[in-house]
Amino acid sequence: MIIAANLKTNLTREKTAKYIKEVESFLNQHNISQEVFVFPAISNLISSSANVVVGAQNAYPTQNGAFTGEIGNEQLEEFGIKTILIGHSERRHVIGETQDSLIVKFNFYKNLGFKIIYCVGEPLHIREMGHEKMMEYISAQYVGIDAAYENLIIAYEPVWAIGTGLTPTLEDIKMIHKELKAKSTAPLLYGGSVKVTNVEEVLALDGVDGVLVGSAALYVEHFCTMCEYAQNIDKKNKKL
């Protein structure tokens, strides 16, 4: 299973380094073999540890150049970073990234062989228009994206659930993941108010290959517990 922490614009460089060290220690002590990713704020980028892959929340599709306020692959190379989040709802709806710009970014980092966690999901007003309209909206986010890319991970994140404490029902998550699984064989994560009190149920659902965790991941002990839950569920599934 895949457990990913999006730390967003939180923590300092010192606190991020401590966070990753604590996660690494926990994974070692508990023999956890799941894929674990941490996406720190840009100023806090550091190299991956043995069991924690550090990725970029965002980067401009360039090696370097005159792109004020951005970072490019040259800056990521310094830390050996080869993993990136693309299409997160906050990049789409707060920063204003368009599907066309995301396609350019996706293709640039795909051509460099990056592992890409590509995010899709619907805002509340689209969800309220009904299931068919919701799936049309989500399907449009696949346009121009190579869904067969071998280093692709997809994260479904209902925009209305992010940071609100609201979550779809387990049955809703299961149903949507089933439909999205038909679009790509890539691992499919769930994101959207994932927390330590609901993650075990979410991870146990058919079609859920892991979780992308936001604010709840800021509590390192909670994130570590989520990693342990994933390990236990993975072991249980392998016995079936």
UniProtKB/Swiss-Prot annotation:
<dbReference type="GO" id="GO:0005829">
    <property type="term" value="C:cytosol"/>
</dbReference>
<feature type="active site" description="Proton acceptor">
    <location>
        <position position="157"/>
    </location>
</feature>
<dbReference type="GO" id="GO:0046166">
    <property type="term" value="P:glyceraldehyde-3-phosphate biosynthetic process"/>
</dbReference>
<dbReference type="InterPro" id="IPR035990">
    <property type="entry name" value="TIM_sf"/>
</dbReference>
<dbReference type="InterPro" id="IPR020861">
    <property type="entry name" value="Triosephosphate_isomerase_AS"/>
</dbReference>
<feature type="binding site">
    <location>
        <position position="163"/>
    </location>
    <ligand>
        <name>substrate</name>
    </ligand>
</feature>
<feature type="binding site">
    <location>
        <begin position="6"/>
        <end position="8"/>
    </location>
    <ligand>
        <name>substrate</name>
    </ligand>
</feature>
<dbReference type="InterPro" id="IPR000652">
    <property type="entry name" value="Triosephosphate_isomerase"/>
</dbReference>
<dbReference type="Pfam" id="PF00121">
    <property type="entry name" value="TIM"/>
</dbReference>
<keyword id="KW-0312">Gluconeogenesis</keyword>
<keyword id="KW-0324">Glycolysis</keyword>
<dbReference type="InterPro" id="IPR013785">
    <property type="entry name" value="Aldolase_TIM"/>
</dbReference>
<comment type="similarity">
    <text>Belongs to the triosephosphate isomerase family.</text>
</comment>
<protein>
    <recommendedName>
        <fullName>Triosephosphate isomerase</fullName>
        <ecNumber>5.3.1.1</ecNumber>
    </recommendedName>
</protein>
<feature type="binding site">
    <location>
        <position position="193"/>
    </location>
    <ligand>
        <name>substrate</name>
    </ligand>
</feature>
<dbReference type="GO" id="GO:0019563">
    <property type="term" value="P:glycerol catabolic process"/>
</dbReference>
<comment type="pathway">
    <text>Carbohydrate biosynthesis; gluconeogenesis.</text>
</comment>
<dbReference type="GO" id="GO:0006096">
    <property type="term" value="P:glycolytic process"/>
</dbReference>
<comment type="pathway">
    <text>Carbohydrate degradation; glycolysis; D-glyceraldehyde 3-phosphate from glycerone phosphate: step 1/1.</text>
</comment>
<dbReference type="GO" id="GO:0004807">
    <property type="term" value="F:triose-phosphate isomerase activity"/>
</dbReference>
<keyword id="KW-0963">Cytoplasm</keyword>
<dbReference type="GO" id="GO:0006094">
    <property type="term" value="P:gluconeogenesis"/>
</dbReference>
<comment type="subunit">
    <text>Homodimer.</text>
</comment>
<keyword id="KW-0413">Isomerase</keyword>
<feature type="active site" description="Electrophile">
    <location>
        <position position="88"/>
    </location>
</feature>
<comment type="function">
    <text>Involved in the gluconeogenesis. Catalyzes stereospecifically the conversion of dihydroxyacetone phosphate (DHAP) to D-glyceraldehyde-3-phosphate (G3P).</text>
</comment>
